[in-house]
Amino acid sequence: FGGTHPKKPGNQLAADLATSMLEQSWERPPAKKGVPHSIPEKLFNPHSYVKGRFLSPEKAKLEGGWKWSEPEWKKLSGGKRGRYLGKPLLHTAKPGSTATIDFEGSAIGAFVLAGPDAGVLEFVIDGKVKGTVTLGHRYSRGLHYPRSVMFAHDLKPGKHTISLTLSEKGKVEGKTSAARILQFCVN
């Protein structure tokens, strides 16, 4: 699983860094009174996700084949992690179907389950910003892999509307493609 779940050497590196930091901190006597530290007004990276939050897809306006329900997992190939089962999510397997949601912020993405049938989403933000996002990941071939995809990260702060359409481009060898959204990611 790459850098997300390191093997023993990666875990040891993280543990050693934490130990070193704590030991150095404890060498000094504690301050008599704690001082609160706030987040600087001017961030080092203006596109930081410091205001990141989830937005429920339940609020989306659905057209065509989008549904807010639990998919029929038993009919779908690929492994599934139990923590994502038994819950409703926003999903479609019908190319051309559109879901639209309003949000406030400067960035929008989605936390998805990308399985063997993961497709391509076309997006339009405020009728101007357009693009596509491929939902599949190399781990999606045998697993409904949880991952986040970003549609835009540098919007003008404020109110926006995004429309998502399952693309015909995601179909492979006549098989259907799908999109499964657990949460929208907004900053």
Regions found by a protein language model. Give the residues of each.
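Conserved catalytic region of serine esterases and O-acyltransferases that act on ester linkages
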Residues: 1-187
